[in-house]
């Protein structure tokens, strides 16, 4: 039996770690230099909960220069991984201000996995000494944002340590294979019509 193809597209501000997350997941390595979106589309068979799927990963550039091109990669997406950096308040705020309106416009109804990246830096005291303007985003703030945008799942990860990186992509696959049940509207059985 052929495995199901799932198109997974990563979206979010530039420099939040989307490409690093993809490289960490697919090659178990962490690029030490900032490389703006050089991840080629990637496809591999992945087994999650006994189901084999062909996972297609698409990277996008978050920079404004790509605002007109980026939506072309949304076509046919089964799930979005919407990323912000846990050490960048601006990237967190842009989830609701920029990315959700864009995704809802170009790909309404496609499930979203909300991901907080750079988890290793959130508790790194030296990072905040070196970057006094940086404001960490808490897990509670991430959970609140998940509810606000209607995301299926919220996960925090570190591509550098690989903490929860596999969990991000497993969640993306699961939300496609087992979509959350929609709340059914109660039907009024005691209806009558006057003619």
Swiss-Prot record:
Motif (Effector region): 34-42
Phenotype reported upon loss of the gene: Fewer and shorter root hairs. Plants lacking both ARAC4/ROP2 and ARAC3/ROP6 exhibit long and narrow petals, as well as increased anisotropic cell expansion of petal epidermis during flower development, as a result of increased microtubule ordering in petal abaxial epidermal cells.
One Pfam family from the record: Ras
Primary site of residence: cytoplasm
InterPro entries from the UniProt entry: P-loop_NTPase, Small_GTP-bd, Small_GTPase, Small_GTPase_Rho
UniProt keyword Nucleotide-binding, yes or no: yes
Classification via Gene3D superfamilies: P-loop containing nucleotide triphosphate hydrolases
Family: Belongs to the small GTPase superfamily. Rho family.
The protein, known as: Rac-like GTP-binding protein ARAC4
């Amino acid at each position: 039996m052929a495995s199901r193809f799932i198109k997974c597209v990563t979206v979010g501000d530039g420099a939040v770690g989307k490409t690093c997350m993809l490289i960490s997941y697919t090659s178990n390595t962490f690029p030490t230099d900032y490389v703006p979106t050089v991840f080629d589309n990637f496809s591999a068979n992945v087994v999650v909960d006994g189901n084999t799927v062909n996972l297609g990963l698409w990277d996008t550039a978050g920079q404004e220069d790509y605002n007109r091109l980026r939506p072309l990669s949304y076509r046919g997406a089964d799930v979005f991984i919407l990323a912000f950096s846990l050490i960048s308040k601006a990237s967190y705020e842009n989830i609701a201000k920029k990315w959700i309106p864009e995704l809802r416009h170009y790909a309404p109804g496609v499930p979203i996995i909300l991901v907080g990246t750079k988890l290793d830096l959130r508790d790194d005291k030296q990072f905040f000494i070196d970057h006094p303007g940086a404001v960490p985003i808490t897990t509670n703030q991430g959970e609140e944002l998940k509810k606000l945008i209607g995301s299926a799942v919220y996960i925090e990860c570190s591509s550098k340590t690989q903490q929860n990186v596999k969990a991000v992509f497993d969640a993306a696959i699961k939300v496609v294979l087992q979509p959350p049940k929609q709340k059914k509207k109660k039907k009024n059985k005691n209806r009558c019509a006057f003619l």
